[in-house]
Amino acid sequence: MSEPQDTTTAPSTTAAPMPTSTSQDSPSAQQPAQVSSATAASAAATAAAASAAVANPPMNGTTTRPSEELSCLWQGCSEKCPSPEALYEHVCERHVGRKSTNNLNLTCQWGSCRTTTVKRDHITSHIRVHVPLKPHKCDFCGKAFKRPQDLKKHVKTHADDSVLVRSPEPGARNPDMMFGGGAKGYATAAHYFEPALNAVPSQGYAHGAPQYYQSHPPPQPANPSYGNVYYALNHGPEAGHASYESKKRGYDALNEFFGDLKRRQFDPNSYAAVGQRLLGLQSLSLPVLSSGPLPEYQPMPAPVAVGGGGYSPGGAPSAPAYHLPPMSNVRTKNDLINIDQFLQQMQDTIYENDDNVAAAGVAQPGAHYVHGGMSYRTTHSPPTQLPPSHATATSSASMMPNPATHSPSTGTPALTPPSSAQSYTSGRSPVSLPSATRVSPPHHEGGSMYPRLPSATMADSMAAGYPTASSTAPPSTLGGIFDHDDRRRYTGGTLQRARPETRQLSEEMDLTQDSKDEGERTPKAKEHSSPSSPERISASLIDPALSGTAAEAEATLRTAQAATEVAERADVQWVEKVRLIEYLRNYIASRLERGEFENNESGGGNSSSNGSSHEQTPEASPDTHMEGVESEVPSKAEEPAVKPEAGDVVMYPTLRAVDEDGDSKMP
């Protein structure tokens, strides 16, 4: 009956300080009377409610009844504290103690608990289990916990993964953005891309967040606070800087490559030197490695809006444009022409490489190289019908006449088709000819972009040491009389002789024998040959005459597979070199077509009246002189203009012919 006594004494204590407020005393007196009547009817229910209120305090850790005290249940202690904080401090200081005061107790004696720890921090954390103190509050649902580890376990119950990557700092981010919230303004969420998106007006979505960010949530969700999302700005300013640095490295490497060409730093007729020099350009971002030849002054493209939002009324922010300086090694038209000639020599060297020509007879890798939008043939077989003239994929006309174009009926092929039954040694191989006798592939503009193999006359083939059997081969049609429709695949590093089809027939005919003894011996030979039959199917490119036992056949098969892989890698490298050379030639040709070069000759006519027209010639410019390519400066052959007569000005120099004796005479 202590509860009714407490409630009845409450009015007397509250009415004492306010004797004059009689109008407010009657309601305060009626309320305790109603509570006392209710508790008198159900005393047990009231006690249960009071105990529940003590066991489950509110989230801030305070109780609903300030006058209620919390008892310490430590063994032998009857202390009462007014708040959970005071109770926790009492247990830690009085019962746990400290090592410095020589009263440290690492065993919990709260009620029947006898938990023992090894450190004071551990037992003080354990005391929170018994004390109704919940200082750790969940930022998402507001639920409070006693220990930090309990809060961590609770956070994991939130299903959304974006909760786990949320920054715990207060005010760092809006929690609604974690769950991909719907149509909210997000006007204040400008923390990720503030430096890059200052010019974009902050506007909210009227139709919800874009589907792009809902279906593909990134580890750090992209900022949906703007109606327009631009690719050029989502990456921040670092992406544009990295792109500029990458393009500048490729641009400088290309300029250095052109400078090495001018100074003849490597031999363009050596396949190894050409491949080693091109290797440094293949891994760089060149200004020409795109759909077509582009100028080096290439600004960044305009940003494209994604995510369903159109451009804002204020307009998209202008993308930062960068400009690269002009190449110092390709400034004049003469530089471009001579570098194109160097590239043509390198292209001829790649096409006439011994390894690639000998890989599959006449079916060299260049035979399946097609320009068609920089696409290549997927098979190694040569085309069924070859046009009368072929050309590699170049965009500029050839700089010199090429004697390789011919009629299909005027000579024999310089390289015998691989279907011939004879093999060549190193001394009699078609590719062992001197480099001077080779003919570079022609370069013509036209619809057909197949490179044509060189041809040789009967006298040339006989003088070069070709067998007489090759003189009966057809013209450069790559074996056109053998199988026009179903072409065989010519791979590198393997024999080209087909498997005889009569072996299985001979095994079937061995079933009929003349004598019994021979019939008994025959199946024994078949037993040894039967296990190798599945392997012979997979090793169809190996000559059956070279196969022996099963172990030898397996070793030969592995060797052939390794050789095929090496040949495929070499073919891929060859195609990359050809592609890079074609890009470089397209780049030079495009600059010649657009006129992107310095005209140093334009000032010669204006200064001729001063008698210095000969100083403006291309040969006098230090930038236009090409070592090893240009002939000597024709200073003796070309003389400056004659002195003008009275009243007549001659604007053009007069040339004098030079005879064999060195005496010059006027024409």
Swiss-Prot record:
Q: Low complexity bias: where?
A: 7-45, 391-400
What is an annotated GO biological process for this record, any one? positive regulation of transcription by RNA polymerase II
Q: Where are the zinc fingers (C2H2-type)?
A: 70-95, 106-130, 136-158
Q: What induces it?
A: By alkaline conditions.
The alphabetized UniProt keywords are:
Activator, Cytoplasm, DNA-binding, Metal-binding, Nucleus, Repeat, Repressor, Transcription, Transcription regulation, Zinc, Zinc-finger
Record motif YPX[LI] motif 2, residues = 652-655
Q: Where is this motif: YPX[LI] motif 1?
A: 450-453
Biased composition annotated in UniProt, kind: Polar residues: 404-438
Subcellular location per the Swiss-Prot or TrEMBL entry: Cytoplasm; Nucleus
Give positions of region: Disordered. 1-45, 371-537, 597-667
Compositional bias per record (Basic and acidic residues), positions renumbered to this chain: 513-529, 622-646, 657-667
User: What exactly does this protein do?
Assistant: Transcription factor that mediates regulation of both acid- and alkaline-expressed genes in response to ambient pH. At alkaline ambient pH, activates transcription of alkaline-expressed genes (including PACC itself) and represses transcription of acid-expressed genes.
Q: Can you tell me which family this protein belongs to?
A: Belongs to the pacC/RIM101 family.
Q: What is this protein called?
A: pH-response transcription factor pacC/RIM101
Which taxonomic lineage does the organism of this UniProt entry have? Answer: Eukaryota, Fungi, Dikarya, Ascomycota, Pezizomycotina
Q: What gene does the UniProt entry assign to this protein?
A: PACC
